[in-house]
Amino acid sequence: MSFEKSVGAVVFRKEEDEVFFLLLHYISGHWDFPKGHVEEGESEHETLRREVQEETGIRDLGIISGFKRNIFYSYRPGGKEREKKKGVAHIIKKVVYYAAETESVEIGLSHEHKGFEWLPYDEAIGRITHDNGKNILLKANIFLKKKK
């Protein structure tokens, strides 16, 4: 068994009185938030900024203090990952999520994605593929409403 840590961002923007959340359509078919592995020597905030910029081109992120949530899941490595991690049958993954605001609307997608959407909460919660992501969005939405 192996352990991995990633950092993700619930990226949102405000337009008048409405909040729009950024969801990425991954090549594998699922919809989720930008996220990625922590590189050696990086802080969580550095990872968040790097991953969001690499995956979307967004540079003007304001990380919202007070929102930090963790999810855990396990999976079996496949394909190239299986070759790199010979002998590892199971990976336990921790993803730390932050909320981050942007004023950017245009996105420069990375090769990892085939699309994106800026969606209001009610549509975003239905679009996210995995229950962990839905739960993070629910918590972020509640947090942002209280912060108004």
Residue ranges and their predicted role:
Residues 1-21:
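Conserved N-terminal beta-strand and adjoining loop/helix that marks the start
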Residues 18-61:
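Conserved Nudix-box catalytic region and its N-terminal flanking loop in Nudix hydrolases
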Residues 139-146:
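C-terminal alpha-helix
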Residues 32, 92, 118:
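Short aromatic/basic micro-patch
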Residues 11-13, 25-26, 101-102:
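Residue-level signal for short segments within beta-strands and strand-turn junctions
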